[in-house]
Amino acid sequence: MDLAFELRKALETGKVILGSNETIRLAKTGGAKLIIVAKNAPKEIKDDIYYYAKLSDIPVYEFEGTSVELGTLLGKPFVVASLAIVDPGESRILALAKR
């Protein structure tokens, strides 16, 4: 699977929420179908995301690149430490959850 292609497709056709605060909020409420976190995200943020995602039974995929690379992959001019997939749209991004 081409991660960049599927992420952009989810961004265009589905609902993707960027940012750690919103991602943690969605992890707490169970409002996401998949959470993606950058490898270099701050430890406190990663710990919170993994903890709440586990409680809500939401799969978490750790992006192998940095938050700068994740932001660039999404076509954003800023860093993205984490994001939540609320609706995958026409993408197959949820296949990452099975890895």
Curated annotation (Swiss-Prot):
Keyword annotations: Ribonucleoprotein, Ribosomal protein
GO cellular component, one term: cytosolic large ribosomal subunit
Superkingdom field: Archaea
Any GO molecular function: RNA binding
A biological-process GO annotation: translation
InterPro entries (UniProt xref): Ribosomal_eL30, Ribosomal_eL30-like, Ribosomal_eL30-like_sf, Ribosomal_eL30_CS, Ribosomal_eL8/eL30/eS12/Gad45
Cited HAMAP family: Ribosomal_eL30
Family affiliation: Belongs to the eukaryotic ribosomal protein eL30 family.
Protein name, as recorded: Large ribosomal subunit protein eL30
Organism: Pyrococcus abyssi (strain GE5 / Orsay)
Lineage, highest ranks first: Archaea, Methanobacteriati, Methanobacteriota, Thermococci, Thermococcales
